[in-house]
Curated annotation (Swiss-Prot):
InterPro entries: 4Fe4S_Fe-S-bd, 4Fe4S_Fe_S_CS, NADH_quinone_OxRdtase_chainI, NDHI. NDH is composed of at least 16 different subunits, 5 of which are encoded in the nucleus. The gene is ndhI. The keyword Plastid applies. This is NAD(P)H-quinone oxidoreductase subunit I, chloroplastic.
Amino acid sequence: MFPMITGFMNYGQQTVRAARYIGQSFMITLSHTNRLPVTIQYPYEKLLTSERFRGRIHFEFDKCIACEVCVRVCPIDLPVVDWKLETYIRKKRLLNYSIDFGICIFCGNCVEYCPTNCLSMTEEYELSTYDRHELNYNQIALGRLPMSAIGDYTIRTIMNSPQTKIKTSMDKPFDSRTITNH
């Protein structure tokens, strides 16, 4: 008889605890209803990347000494380095350097361990194509400097309009058009 009474007490405690958890979750949900949506309309407004963002790799052909450190530290042996040994000067001459960004995991090991700093990570993240073979960049494509996000005209609207400058009338409901089209 006593186990039955303690069972009912445990059931009652569990019911109260479940109701409290449901109430807490509703309070959290309702606290988010007063916030304005933070949405970036991607093709027209671009995301500002952080300083440590790991985007497309930039390659400087003149600095490379064909040491192949980038290939050895890459977890997937991705960079393809073609070189020829110049016997009269006893140095390697770089012929071709390429990286396939369809396979690259953007870990940044090649950039970190390069002894001549000929590799660097850029803030470019728009690498999507319809054909995966277009993601295989040679030394010419890797040497192309990316367009800075700060100088891009589509970024200016985000940088110059903090949340405090947005003016909307209180009778209009808040939606994505109200915030982005000021």
